[in-house]
């Protein structure tokens, strides 16, 4: 077993001299170091992010609510700026738009989600109140980094979660994080020193060459999933693309970390640690090359489309959560239109009021769409019972909604395509998406 190096303060916490919660979280940290194969702990100087109280408290740590309360009363705080990830429907979220979403029978038998008492009880608000006192900013989003107004800078050590977020932290911001965001890392301000915290592990090993100039949102989405499947845990350097915008970064990141487990990549000239292709590889040669041909993109598109009927029951947009510009552009597309089938639009709570103030919420409501926030369909317990064919514009959502919550008869099917394809489906109830549309 690895003997993890500890300073005097860490030893005191591990021995229980500073209370139960510090001891339990230090035990967890030491065990994580041993699992990761490192004897070193890194002090965090960036930001942290973790999922909801129920998930964190139940699976990560063995102490009671009362012990946490004692810690807070004694002045315990998170040691780094800490944000909350999206929430399962049965706890805190959606903050807005959950009423009448036809999910009442899911996961809790006959207990209705629109029962206000049940909803408040299920929020675990007592944990969130303590977390607020400890300094948590409750963004309730998979893309907290887009609304936090405070992001880590290049080289800072962080502790994040979420598929689109980890590559964003490492590749786009140039900060450093593994997939280990938790109460423990944020409370201690410490994490195991391995993988993306180590400079040598951040250099590219696989060269990705694109035959087609990647420039549209869906092309980036498909490319991300394809690279993830091919590269797995490797660090790719990607060539043959236009310069991605924020939305396209998020879509590719989510696809990469769904099709595979890519925490880091480089796009020479677009990401901060790769001013050149040579710099991306740290002066070394690629181990191998991945060639992204038209047939690779087509095969990935077809894999994410699995439906035998063109009749669509529901459309879902907002995986990852839509940012402010996404909401503005979507409002332009929906203004003056009327949906024929349910259209759910998901964003983060801090942007819901922005959408309301800017008039986007009214446009969505007038169109018959539902703006929701703080969660996602994969965290809500699946789809409403009437949905057997859903249209999405996200590789991640296509993958997770059927993988996490297959229905009893395995009848849930997915139509995957551009946002415009999805809007057309919402207006007509029919799927008319096609691979030829992906460049639009």
Q: At which residue positions do the language-model features occur?
A:
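Non-transmembrane, aqueous-exposed alpha-helical and coiled segments at domain scale
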Residues: 1-440
């Amino acid at each position: 077993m690895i003997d993890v190096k500890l300073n005097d303060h860490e030893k005191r916490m591990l021995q229980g001299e500073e209370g139960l919660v510090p001891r339990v979280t230090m035990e967890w940290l030491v065990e994580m170091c041993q699992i990761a194969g490192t004897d070193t702990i890194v002090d965090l100087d960036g930001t942290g992010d973790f999922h909801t109280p129920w998930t964190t408290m139940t699976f990560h740590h063995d102490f009671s609510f009362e012990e946490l309360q004692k810690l807070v009363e004694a002045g315990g705080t998170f040691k780094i700026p800490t944000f909350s990830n999206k929430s399962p429907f049965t706890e805190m979220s959606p903050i807005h738009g959950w009423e009448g979403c036809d999910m009442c029978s899911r996961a809790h038998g006959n207990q209705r989600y629109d029962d206000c008492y049940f909803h408040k009880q299920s929020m675990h608000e007592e944990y969130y109140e303590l977390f607020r006192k400890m300094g948590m900013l409750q963004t309730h989003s998979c893309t907290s980094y887009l609304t936090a107004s405070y992001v880590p800078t290049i080289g800072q050590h962080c502790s994040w979660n979420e598929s689109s977020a980890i590559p964003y932290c490492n590749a786009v911001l140039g900060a450093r994080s593994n997939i280990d965001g938790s109460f423990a890392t944020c409370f201690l301000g410490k994490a195991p020193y391995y993988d993306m915290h180590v400079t040598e592990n951040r250099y590219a090993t696989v060269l990705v060459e694109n035959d087609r100039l990647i420039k549209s949102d869906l092309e980036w989405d498909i490319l991300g999933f394809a690279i993830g499947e091919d590269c797995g845990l490797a660090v790719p350097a990607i060539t043959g693309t236009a310069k991605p915008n924020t939305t396209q970064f998020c879509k590719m990141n989510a696809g990469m970390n769904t099709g595979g487990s890519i925490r880091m990549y480089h796009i020479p000239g677009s990401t901060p640690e790769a001013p050149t292709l040579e710099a991306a590889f740290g002066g070394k040669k690629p181990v191998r090359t991945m060639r992204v041909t038209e047939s690779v993109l087509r095969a990935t598109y077809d894999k994410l489309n699995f439906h035998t009927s063109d009749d669509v029951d529901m459309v879902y947009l907002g995986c990852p959560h839509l940012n402010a510009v996404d909401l503005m552009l979507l409002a332009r597309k929906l203004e003056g239109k009327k949906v024929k089938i349910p259209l759910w639009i998901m964003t983060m709570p801090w942007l819901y009021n922005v959408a309301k103030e800017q008039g986007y919420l009214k446009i969505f409501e007038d169109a018959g769409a539902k703006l929701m926030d703080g969660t996602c369909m994969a965290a809500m317990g699946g789809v409403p019972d009437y949905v057997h064919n859903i249209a999405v514009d996200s590789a991640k959502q296509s993958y997770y909604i059927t993988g996490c919550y297959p229905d009893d008869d395995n009848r849930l099917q997915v139509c995957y395509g551009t946002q415009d394809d999805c809007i057309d489906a919402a207006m007509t109830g029919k799927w008319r998406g096609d691979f030829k549309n992906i460049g639009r």
